From Swiss-Prot:
It is found in: Apical cell membrane. The modification Phosphothreonine is found at residue 542. The gene is SLC22A12. Coiled coil: none annotated. Keywords: Cell membrane, Disease variant, Glycoprotein, Ion transport, Membrane, Phosphoprotein, Transmembrane, Transmembrane helix, Transport. Changing residue 305 to S: In some gout patients; uncertain significance. This is Solute carrier family 22 member 12. It comes from Homo sapiens (Human).
Amino acid sequence: MAFSELLDLVGGLGRFQVLQTMALMVSIMWLCTQSMLENFSAAVPSHRCWAPLLDNSTAQASILGSLSPEALLAISIPPGPNQRPHQCRRFRQPQWQLLDPNATATSWSEADTEPCVDGWVYDRSIFTSTIVAKWNLVCDSHALKPMAQSIYLAGILVGAAACGPASDRFGRRLVLTWSYLQMAVMGTAAAFAPAFPVYCLFRFLLAFAVAGVMMNTGTLLMEWTAARARPLVMTLNSLGFSFGHGLTAAVAYGVRDWTLLQLVVSVPFFLCFLYSWWLAESARWLLTTGRLDWGLQELWRVAAINGKGAVQDTLTPEVLLSAMREELSMGQPPASLGTLLRMPGLRFRTCISTLCWFAFGFTFFGLALDLQALGSNIFLLQMFIGVVDIPAKMGALLLLSHLGRRPTLAASLLLAGLCILANTLVPHEMGALRSALAVLGLGGVGAAFTCITIYSSELFPTVLRMTAVGLGQMAARGGAILGPLVRLLGVHGPWLPLLVYGTVPVLSGLAALLLPETQSLPLPDTIQDVQNQAVKKATHGTLGNSVLKSTQF
């Protein structure tokens, strides 16, 4: 018997799978808080230069008479581009002439100002502390904030490259357990980082482990669940991220100090580390690596949890050995990336699906990690992202079944891109409309993620499927790294980053229309199967055109 029959024997969808899905889904929710954390821990508070007349009590006492704080601000800090107090410059000397009601903007010149040589004063009414205020990541150092986010996302990229081979060699559960511990330790260490480069290093190592959690969570769910239930289980796993957005907003609303917030979202992974020892190692991996005794013990344990303890009498080492031989005989030799890119039809599919993966990572992380640019209440925005993400993903699943893969993916990307582009035309003062369009756009990106995850698996043959999907996921992570850096274009115009974020999914959505439809088609196992599907489609199209021509009056 094949492994799928062994899984049905011990229970492919029972109490064990329910408990396993719940346990892993909890860790995914807390993992999402780490990825979205810097919306709050790295929020940029309102700030201005430190000025003696405003912030030095001795200087204030030397002023004859009494001046209001507004008057002291006017003679100490020049107006900025938005006519509010400048965030990065101050007057070299108090401009007393500005107290004259007849004073104008020409009463002072740029030469009368200087950078914030004595530091900044931050508004602490919303957040008592952020990494931006701690290390002064503003003005000339403002690029360091998106750089820190890109370093975190680069850690996920590097971790994915390392954790995949590690889990194939040492096992899924062992790498997952280590990743939980590494996330807990590195997250806790980041809270006490003495300097910004050290903080970035700890966040990079934390993100390295994030990749291990994401990859091995999905693998364990897939390898312990019957084929008929895998779409449901993987959708629930994906919804863990949706619930994680709401959890992030709730925790950040209650904890306004970045150090404590970093601790609160890191400590739960110590608990995940402890209960991960209960999780079963993948029996499929154990069998294919020759660990028959361990694999038998895990299968017996799962059978007992699922109420099928009697199978121990029939599930013997000989049966396992037979299953392993059959499973290996059914396998096919792996094909290389060169094969994927060498054949024109596969190369075309690879380029477009990779572009769609890139658009997801680039747009989602570019927008979702800078909520301050999308609206005034970032707590509600973070909550709404999770609320909208749930129906977006569920709706995408329904449309994939009824409308088809190609139109659903294209529509999701086009919706996301058009909502983002529309935001470039909305005045900054219309915060509610800007927030609504941004959340709707992110919902479209979430739907596109569901589509491309399923669609890309159906576009490629079995011998190349993991290579193609892995390439797409690498493109998504590469896009995620670039996404935050595009915000630096905002110095040339606040609309420019949104223009880039909106254009990429629109172009990807249009390109997706060129892909073949795979709805109701069997999964191709070989490259020849893909070619046969293309020939059938071309033949069907030719016959269809002939029928239409023959029935015209």
